[in-house]
Amino acid sequence: MWQVSGAHGAIDPVRAVDAMLAYHDAGFFTWDLADHYGPAEDLIGDFRRRFAASRGAERLSEIQAFTKWVPYPGRMTRRTVEDAISVSRRRMGVDRLDLLQFHWWDYSDRGYLDALRHLADLRDEGQIRHLALTNFDTERLRIIADHGIRVVSNQVQYSLIDRRPDARMAAFCGDHKITLLAYGTLLGGLLSEKYFGRPEPQRSELNTASLQKYKNMIDAWGGWKLFQELLTVVNGIAEKHQVSIANVGVRYVVDRPAVAGVIVGARLGIAQHLADNARTFGFALDEADFQLIEAVLVKSRDLMTVIGDCGDEYR
């Protein structure tokens, strides 16, 4: 639900919840959001109320809403942490958060360990079901594990062009029973038929924050010419399986070791891709597909060297 935070088109709350109901009816039950994604947590609250009224309160357990807490730098007291979690629970209309994903801006400030200890206490007390992370690197995962703090997942950027989790993180997560939730898998929409065969777009043509962000990632990875080479290969694979380019991109990542799910953005009330998204689960990539993809990817730059580990682009 990052798209409701701004720079992706105006969101009408009623139409947005209409779209959320349609997604649920199509079998998409889990939402990813954050405390700072504009009205995202409030929309979850509205969605739950309308869902209970129209589908029955007894079915509310079908809905999963994975939110995030992204605190400002400062001292992490029990009061600070609990107050923030209480705000999210109130906005979302729940007694307990399904999954709380914690983000921290500055690793030199070890206050993230204090915050996580308090969050773990709140989990044990029943205010949070599962504790998780977002955009933490492998070294910080190790430190957190060494301090005995149990987390179930880490949300990181993971796509055909950004395979940094493969370098260190996936193996660490496998050893410590931590899963990965992947975002950025469709590069904000650039990994699609719309951009296949197109000249390199000017920045003024990229009309959402996501398109601008992931065009920068493509530039760091290898540039537009190599990206078109990748799209050519992926389009051929998509035609072979009678699916879309986006389906191939998601299938590739969801099958990676340690990946528990892929987050696909939705411009609620503006653009929906219900039927196309569902096709992701109706086919499998074969060894020939992987070889064709790898033949292009080996020509790219190593983003671990260019950017650093997962999440380093935010620090």
How would you label these PLM feature ranges?
Residues 1-63:
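N-terminal binding-site loop/beta-alpha segment at the start of enzyme catalytic domains
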Residues 11, 21, 25, 74-167, ...:
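Glycine/proline-rich, positively charged
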Residues 20, 41, 45-48, 82-89, ...:
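Generic structural signal for well-ordered alpha-helices
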Residues 23, 31, 44, 65, ...:
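Conserved, mostly hydrophobic/aromatic
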Residues 50-61, 92-93, 122-127, 146-150, ...:
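Short helix-capping segments at alpha-helix termini
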Residues 59-73, 100-103:
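A short, structured active-site edge motif that brings together acidic residues
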Residues 165-210, 244:
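Aromatic-lined glycan-binding groove of carbohydrate-active enzymes
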Residues 175-179, 201-236, 240, 255-261, ...:
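Terminal-tail/helix-coil boundary detector
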